């Protein structure tokens, strides 16, 4: 199974963002990817006051990525988008997965919301405008069990242990918009930790660059193997990186170091 992580600089123009995402998906398909992952909020990343009308799963964004997956014959984890939420004040931060035929295979709503107040540095209250999801999701991608997550979920290892131990995940995907000041110190460390402790591949696709005054995303999208080794990583700027997932290596690691089987708690 060949996976691609697609790194994007989404801004405040939904149509331009979708067009840029499509170019990255085409590059992933040209590189032989079976599965491509896009970043968090692929539809819009700009001032909250200018956010376009949130949509249902079968709205413009969902329909666009369904068509792209079908045209390219490739599985697509369409990052995440602003799904119409439970009330007028809240959206859901939702990841959609489409199969090669463009059919919706799974959807996941971000569970852990980024509520942070660091005086003089950052103030962000995601829960003010986003409702949390409640259900972990694992989807079967042609025999590869893929656990879904979004950005801030990465800091909560309990979710990933559940995806691996109860959901049987082989691959954990992380569409993200990790901020620069935390990404520099934590992004790679957390991704490699989730891979090692759950003996899973991890594919993380991040937003990159400036998006609005005061918000810069770290990028550095990567694929990590179950031993915690980085198989591929992107530098700054939009781009695509591909890696082949060796499931025989995954099985060997789990057999030689059976930490999942040895759990007591």
What are the roles of these predicted feature ranges?
Residues 1-4:
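Extreme N-terminal starter segment of soluble prokaryotic enzymes
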Residues 7-14:
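Short polar catalytic/cofactor-binding loops
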Residues 14, 23-101, 107, 116, ...:
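Cys-nucleophile CN-hydrolase/nitrilase-fold catalytic domain and related Cys-dependent amidase chemistry
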Residues 15-27, 156-163:
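Short, acidic/polar
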Residues 54, 86-166, 179-189, 256-259:
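Active-site catalytic loop in hydrolytic enzyme cores
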Residues 57-78, 145, 154-241:
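CN hydrolase (nitrilase-like) catalytic-core segments centered on the catalytic cysteine
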Residues 78-80, 94-97, 137-139, 221-223, ...:
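Short beta-strand scaffold segments in enzyme catalytic cores
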Residues 248-265:
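A short C-terminal boundary segment appended to hydrolase-like catalytic domains
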